[in-house]
Structures are given as structure tokens and as C-alpha cells.
């Protein structure tokens, strides 16, 4: 964090390559994957993210030293995703975007679900970094229809992942019901009535990556097939007199 590393309530200085190496070595000792995932605190859309690995720590620090000393990052332990999802795209953590809605009776609903996949060797699945999204049946957790890339990134449509050639439609998301339950439980801790949750699926179940107050509803709109016909969207519009 601008030449400072904040872990819990401890603050230390990281003003040189040597101290960066020392601090990252210490952080990596506490991981199970020997990898750290760094995302810019003020970043959006997966831009500027990086992976720091124990196996190439010196190379990573030298390559990213300027950014690490001048910018602010959130440092997280790298997640190992579920093996079946890894078969589709192994370089990025491919996440569910689950949008919750809390109605006027304080009941939490899953408004819609989509899944995002990275392409090539990208370490992020965001559509703004070239990935694509595909609809997920919110009751069964099954991928439906084609995957779609952002128009700004080419607008490609995929029935199979372009790198691994794994068929998309019909793929069943592991631990999907557990992911729904996790979102519904977590939603009660937020004042926002609509939040987009990024959920990763590991071999032992779902984990929360982040919650988004501005969850790019245009992607969910396309994945659902048009939010205008969604009964809960109609309820929302009626509540705000539209």
C-alpha cells in the first residue's frame, strides 16, 4: 500500500526490492497454494491484477516492482478452483456472478446467475479483459445457451471454450446449491438490496471473492434473456413507480 504492507493491525515498510522479497516470502509461508493474488484496490474489471508465486518470486518482484511500490493492492491467497471447472479454463479462477435482490418483505432472492470464463492465458475471467459470460439456470446450476464475449472485445459467441474445446451448455456447476445458500446468508449483512456476488467453486465448496454494489447488470440482462420479462424485475419497477 504505497510502500507499506498492512497485515491485520501491523504496518511495515516495503520501500525496496529486498524488503518486498522478504515480506512476500513471509506471506507465502502462510499459504497452501504457494501463490498470492493481487488486485488494485481502486481497480475495476480485472485490470492490473497479478499473481505472485513462490516458484518465481524474484522474477515477479523485479517485473512488478514499480507498480508494487507506487500503487495499492489487496493481497489474497490464491484459490485452487474445482477440478472440473479447471478443465474448462485453468489459468483464471472462473467465477459465478450471482445477483441477489431483497424484496420489501426482507426476503432474499437470487435474481440471476451467470458464469464467466477466461480466455488464453489470462489470469482473470472478466469480460473487460477478454473473457466471456454464459447464463446459468438459477434453479439447477446448469450452463445454458452460448457464451458471449463483450462487443468491445470482438463479440464472439461460443458453444465450446475456444482453448480447451470443452462443451459449455449442459455443464453442471459443482456445489451450486451451496453457492446459492452462501449468497442468501451473506446478503443479510449488507444494506444494499441488489448486490452482485463473485463466487469461486473449490474442491470443498463455494467461496466469496467479492461483493459488487455496481454489478454490471447489462451482462446479467443478456444472460437472462431480457430482464424486462423477469417477474422480480417487474416487482422492482413497480415499487419505484416505473
State each model region's role:
Residues 156-178, 185-192, 201-242:
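C-terminal active-site "lid" helix and adjoining low-complexity regulatory extension at the edge
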Residues 45-46, 119-121, 207, 216-218:
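Flexible loop/turn segments at secondary-structure boundaries
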Residues 65, 80-81, 87-89, 93-178:
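ATP-dependent carboxylate/phosphate-activation module, predominantly the ATP-grasp catalytic core
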Residues 39, 76, 114, 210-214:
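Active-site ExK catalytic segment of metal-dependent nucleases
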Residues 1-105:
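Active-site nucleotide/adenylate-binding loops and adjacent lid/helix of ATP-dependent enzymes
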Residues 91-93, 103-109, 192-194, 203-206, ...:
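Coil-to-beta-strand transition motifs
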Residues 197-199:
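Hydrophobic residue at the +6 position relative to the catalytic HRD Asp in the kinase catalytic loop
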Residues 36, 109-111, 207-209:
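Protein kinase-like catalytic core scaffold
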Amino acid at each position: 500500500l504505497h510502500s507499506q504492507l498492512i497485515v491485520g493491525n501491523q504496518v511495515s515498510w516495503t520501500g525496496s526490492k529486498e524488503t518486498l522479497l522478504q515480506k512476500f516470502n513471509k506471506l507465502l509461508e502462510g499459504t497452501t497454494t504457494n501463490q498470492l493474488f493481487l488486485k488494485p484496490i481502486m481497480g475495476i474489471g480485472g485490470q492490473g491484477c497479478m499473481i505472485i508465486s513462490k516458484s518465481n518470486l524474484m522474477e515477479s518482484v523485479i517485473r512488478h516492482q514499480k507498480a508494487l511500490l507506487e500503487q495499492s493492492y489487496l493481497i489474497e491467497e490464491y484459490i485452487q478452483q474445482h477440478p472440473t471447472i479447471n478443465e474448462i479454463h485453468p489459468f483464471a479462477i472462473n467465477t459465478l456472478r450471482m445477483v441477489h435482490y431483497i424484496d420489501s418483505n426482507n426476503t432474499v432472492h437470487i435474481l440471476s446467475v451467470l458464469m464467466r470464463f477466461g480466455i488464453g492465458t489470462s489470469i482473470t475471467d472478466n469480460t473487460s479483459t477478454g473473457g466471456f459470460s454464459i447464463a446459468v439456470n438459477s434453479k439447477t446450476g446448469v450452463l445454458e445457451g452460448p457464451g458471449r464475449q463483450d462487443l468491445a472485445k470482438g463479440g464472439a459467441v461460443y458453444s465450446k471454450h475456444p482453448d480447451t474445446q470443452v462443451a459449455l451448455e449442459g455443464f453442471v456447476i459443482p456445489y451450486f446449491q451451496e453457492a446459492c445458500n452462501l449468497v442468501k446468508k451473506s446478503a443479510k449483512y449488507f444494506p444494499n438490496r441488489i448486490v452482485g456476488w463473485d463466487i469461486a467453486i473449490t474442491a470443498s465448496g463455494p467461496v466469496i471473492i467479492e461483493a459488487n454494489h455496481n454489478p454490471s447488470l447489462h451482462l446479467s440482462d443478456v444472460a437472462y434473456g431480457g430482464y424486462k420479462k423477469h417477474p422480480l424485475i417487474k416487482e422492482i419497477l413497480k415499487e419505484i413507480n416505473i
